[in-house]
Amino acid sequence: MTLTTEKQVKVVVDRDVVPTSFEKWAKPGHFSRSLAKGPKTTTWIWNLHADAHDFDSHTSSLEEVSRKIFSAHFGQLAIIFIWLSGMYFHGARFSNYVAWLSNPTGIKPSAQVVWPIVGQQILNADVGGGMQGIQITSGLFQLWRASGIVNELQLYVTALGGLGMAGLMIFAGWFHYHKAAPKLEWFQNVESMLNHHLAGLLGLGSLSWAGHQIHVSLPINKLLDAGVAPSSIPLPHEFILNRNLMAELYPSFQQGLVPFFTLNWKQYSDILTFKGGLSPVTGGLWLTDVAHHHLAIAVLFLVAGHMYRTNWGIGHSIKQILEAHKGPLTGEGHKGLYEILTTSWHANLAINLAMLGSLSIIVAHHMYAMPPYPYLATDYPTQLSLFTHHMWIGGFCIVGAGAHAAIYMVRDYSPTVNFNNVLDRMIRHRDAIISHLNWVCIFLGMHSFGLYIHNDTMRALGRAQDMFSDTAIQLQPVFAQWIQQIHTLAPGNTAVNALATASYAFGADTVTVGSKIAMMPIKLGTADFMVHHIHAFTIHVTTLILLKGVLYARNSRLIPDKANLGFRFPCDGPGRGGTCQVSAWDHVFLGLFWMYNALSIVIFHFSWKMQSDVWGTVTSNGAISHITGGNFAQSAITINGWLRDFLWAQASQVIQSYGSSLSAYGLMFLGAHFVWAFSLMFLFSGRGYWQELIESIVWAHNKLKVAPAIAPRALSITQGRAVGVAHYLLGGIATTWAFFLARIIAVG
């Protein structure tokens, strides 16, 4: 008889790699030999911030970089849990949540009370429910109701749970860097990672949410919708433990799991529905539809989490899948991409940021077209805030994708790995790509802007009949209208038992809650056609800048050795007629401004369109009255209309907010304009000017024998641009925030 030795379990961690040292952490710049020496000039503090998280500059070991990123992720999660915990704590301690639950259409959500130090209590408005506070627009009240939270105690407990999770995350971050640090092969085991993330995070995550919705949220929301007082609703565990209690609300519970195992699944159609449309009581998606959706998603992801080959020799191999992708025109196709994505975290991050950013923008649009939570659709300030928020997040992620793709090109790109594959072929015909994209941008910009200029001119000359408008020369968005019609009619054939189309934005009825419009068909016309082409123009220009930055990150005709200069450098000397703003970093810098341009027009379009054509009230006899009375179609077709009827007309609330509970927005509007203007000082002025000024100030200090030990230095060119764009965006975003909220809280 022969004995086979058992296969040893693979150890994928190293023990006690980095000692835990508070002395080391207390030393600023401990990660860099030059920074650890301490400051000689004021540039030191800038370099400290620039390099603290640039792990590539700390070490050349990919394993060590991977461990630092992994550990930092736990730190990030800890911060998120603390932040969430604070949100829930405010809901428990400083809010009118329970009052709002009993009258969500009449009471405004508030979870913040301003302390009266020097008269700030003016900001505490009468929001209803016996509460004086600031109206919040985060949508958390609606989310809590959908979760089945009915009292402050549940919010307190969840807040404590968040702090507990934060502590766990901080511990995990320390443990997996100092005590048991994963080896590089663990980080590069993509099949195992895919299986765990798909089946664990997305599959079991969706399944547990579906379970919570079915066993806790559905019964509680059904009782709330029926008008039962929050204080009389049974506690969540009673619904879970007492089947009879559930069966009163959802009869299929009486049958237990028998229908599941006998495949008689239609018995569960009272908890897992396919109604479509919105609930007429809450104006949100049917929660039974949402539970069904999460159950289906869970099944899909649990299957997906078993698709990739690990220890059992069955399933997909990512490397094989990628290398099989060879088209007739793509040479070696995706060969080499596996090596890129397992050795360059910048390349990996670039793809993930592009995906996540696009997803955030998709979420922004679904939140109003298919509002997921009860009473969200009629809370106009929250709807506007959620749209704006998800658009900004998406824009920043997509620009970040351009940034990290360019860093990959500069730091991690290998010409031997990328021979004649899709990336190499993109780089080899980059001139054709960029010049064509540039032509598209000029075409879109000239024509879309030209339509507006034409209309402004005709209106100024009093020739309304010669304008592009719904009442003169029509430019109807026929393709969009066709898609709307298909989506309105199709469910009648594809989902015969559904009550309504997926979104009322396409067509069908007007949904009202109380007398407020939750959602209704969004009619598209000439004004939408015109502004959509401005969207196309700004998106293409942003793409042009970012893509040019990536494709020319390593070299160009102007600077053949660009890769040697690094990711960020101000210029390559004064020759060749000037070489400024050619670094990959500068393309990201310029791309941020166009991202801001693009998104400003998107959120302005959304804000005005919804106020003009969707949001408003319905009288008892069915007459619809919109906030701005449908003025979008005739006003948004000229530049003057945008300036006069949107920006100026709707700024009256923020400009006249002084002395009211909205006065903070008036001050923010003013202050944010100042921050924005302050940015121009950094963007329109050269470094030499400031260095000269500093030297004359230092001379005066020397005369008085009060010269500092740390020599002052002007910001470098790149630092100045970074400070400039940061204040430009911060000022612009905060100005928009104040403008939007003062307006919509006053009229919405």
From Swiss-Prot:
It is found in: Plastid, Chloroplast thylakoid membrane. Gene3D superfamilies: Photosystem I PsaA/PsaB (1.20.1130.10). Chlorophyll a' binds at H673. The chain crosses the membrane at residues 69-92, 155-178, 194-218, 290-308, 345-368, 384-410, 432-454, 529-547, 587-608, 662-684, 722-742. Chlorophyll a binds at M681, Y689. Its main location: plastid. Keywords: 4Fe-4S, Chlorophyll, Chloroplast, Chromophore, Electron transport, Iron, Iron-sulfur, Magnesium, Membrane, Metal-binding, Oxidoreductase, Photosynthesis, Photosystem I, Plastid, Thylakoid, Transmembrane, Transmembrane helix, Transport. GO terms for cellular component: chloroplast thylakoid membrane; photosystem I. GO terms for biological process: photosynthesis. Its EC number is 1.97.1.12. InterPro entries: PSI_PsaA, PSI_PsaA/B, PSI_PsaA/B_CS, PSI_PsaA/B_sf. P700 is a chlorophyll a/chlorophyll a' dimer, A0 is one or more chlorophyll a, A1 is one or both phylloquinones and FX is a shared 4Fe-4S iron-sulfur center. Phylloquinone binds at W690. It is a multi-pass membrane protein. PROSITE patterns: PHOTOSYSTEM_I_PSAAB. The PsaA/B heterodimer binds the P700 chlorophyll special pair and subsequent electron acceptors. PSI consists of a core antenna complex that captures photons, and an electron transfer chain that converts photonic excitation into a charge separation. The eukaryotic PSI reaction center is composed of at least 11 subunits. This is Photosystem I P700 chlorophyll a apoprotein A1. It comes from Cyanidioschyzon merolae (strain NIES-3377 / 10D). The gene is psaA.
